[in-house]
């Protein structure tokens, strides 16, 4: 039996919202009207776009925060969008279900499809560009696509170095016996890739399911797995000065120096899964998670800022005036 067969049914972040395909995926997006309640619907990420903010979520919803107001903008998709990233003030990408990638060249005002495939049946969970043309999108079951032309074309990659040793041997044996079955099995053996970040020294850090933390010093061409003694899912990662934090299931948060070899667990006063993180210019670190939890972190000490019952918080961002915004299962909000 391979390690992948032992996976639990735990979904990341806010559970099924991220991994189930929308019932409306077969609808024509041109027939879907702007939703008046989009700001209070499921939203899964927020990103800064110059002086503005852009939030993404269910049914292809994209909201733009401009002139201190949130306004929904039209998009060409109605699949769930899980992550949004801006390389500069104008150029941004959002990813989501059905291997969807959409692109904006005007700060989030308008969007076009760069990639989408219902045949892939996997969601992208993150996207990262390290130049105007070069970027990577990652997602469930090892989904990994690369572009070298700003997203005009995307190429699939399989990173065997991130498999368990047992699975590598299993695939090698299977490939010699049945090529079709080999390709089918290969598509489901890698863990979910949940977050990809670029460190200050230009290395890429990838975190995901089954305690996967991996680092690359060649822009994601190859990765080296990092062993930090935990086998639960990691949902996010962030750099704070000379420290790296990874976070995930049931309130598990770990901190290391830049060597990624000296990990300490950060004791949280909660067991809620941690989904999102933000570091300010003053190196203040905030974490958000399930059960409406918002935490501030000082080195390895954690303090609860608030707990909002009945909702899950997935993302946090700061606007141009320094105000914090949160996104999650009940949409966008600020703390009073």
Task: List where the protein language model places each region.
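Residue-level hotspots at or immediately adjacent to binding/recognition sites across diverse folds
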Residues: 25-336
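Bacterial N-terminal signal peptides that target proteins for export
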Residues: 1-10
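N-terminal signal peptide c-region/cleavage motif recognized by signal peptidases
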Residues: 20-22
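Hydrophobic helical h-region of N-terminal Sec-dependent signal peptides
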Residues: 11-15
């Amino acid at each position: 039996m391979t390690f992948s067969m032992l996976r639990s049914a735990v979904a990341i972040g806010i559970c099924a919202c991220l991994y189930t395909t929308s019932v409306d995926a077969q609808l024509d997006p041109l027939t879907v009207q702007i939703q008046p309640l989009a700001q209070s619907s499921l939203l899964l990420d927020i990103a800064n776009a110059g002086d503005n903010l852009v939030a993404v979520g269910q049914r292809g919803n994209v909201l733009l925060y401009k002139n201190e107001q949130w306004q929904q903008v039209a998009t060409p998709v109605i699949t769930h969008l899980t992550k949004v990233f801006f390389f500069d003030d104008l150029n941004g990408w959002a990813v989501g279900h059905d291997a969807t990638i959409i692109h904006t060249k005007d700060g989030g005002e308008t969007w076009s499809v760069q990639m989408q495939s219902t045949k892939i049946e996997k969601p992208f969970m993150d996207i990262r560009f390290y130049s105007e043309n070069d970027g990577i999108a990652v997602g469930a079951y090892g989904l990994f696509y690369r572009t070298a032309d700003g997203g005009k074309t995307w190429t699939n990659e399989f990173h065997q170095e991130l498999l368990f040793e047992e699975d590598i041997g299993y695939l090698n044996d299977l490939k010699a016996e049945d090529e079709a079955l080999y390709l089918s099995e290969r598509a489901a053996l890698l863990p979910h890739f949940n977050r990809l970040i670029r460190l200050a020294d230009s290395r890429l850090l990838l975190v995901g399911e089954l305690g996967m933390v991996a680092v690359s010093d060649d822009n994601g061409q190859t990765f080296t797995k990092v062993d930090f003694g935990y086998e639960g899912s990691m949902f996010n990662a962030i750099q704070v000065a000379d420290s790296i934090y990874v976070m995930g299931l049931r309130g598990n948060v770990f901190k290391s120096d830049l060597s990624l070899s000296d990990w300490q667990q950060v004791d949280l006063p909660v067991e809620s899964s941690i989904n999102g993180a933000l570091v300010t210019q003053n190196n203040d670190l905030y974490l958000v998670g399930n059960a409406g939890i918002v935490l501030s972190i000082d080195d390895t000490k954690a303090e609860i800022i608030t707990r909002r019952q009945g909702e899950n918080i997935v993302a946090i961002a700061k606007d141009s005036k320094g105000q914090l915004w949160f996104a999650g299962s009940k949409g966008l909000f600020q703390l009073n």
